[in-house]
């Protein structure tokens, strides 16, 4: 079997993943390169990440997502590209990756070329929010950071009332991350009421960055 044809049935090597990452990092020079295969930028309480999921058929899939830095189990606005640019085979990568960058610029929201605007991110999250702790925590964090205390408090209360994931077996205890988010909502509510919301969020972020908190 031809070597390149055989490669179609295998995952990308570590070297190939680095090569893919280097191409896109060059297209986004102001973003930080994370060696596990991501490029990121941060603003206030959030991080925007472009990642490249390695697929089993010698290909990768670009995506973008917004993470909450004060509670990194929380993410929203996860997007893939259209069908034409969704899965990029390594044989096509050298001639196609620049077209993928253009597709990212046209399709990903919030824009990967404009500075991050927290109010725009908040509005985008509102359009897809569901009554689950992940989404409600994100909006509580964004509103608290922006000083929109009434809205933030409302989201904190909704965190406590959010139903548990429907896929949990009957009588199964809630997952650790669910309990973590509900506890976070209570502590954020207290910080807002004390006028210390931003300080609380910055402290929580620093604790994760120092490794004092774990997923």
Residue ranges and their predicted role:
Residues 2-9, 44-215:
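Intrinsically disordered, low-complexity regulatory regions enriched in serine/threonine/proline
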Residues 13-35:
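Amphipathic alpha-helical segments
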Residues 16, 42-45:
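Short, surface-exposed loop/strand segments
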Residues 34-42:
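An N-terminal domain-cap segment
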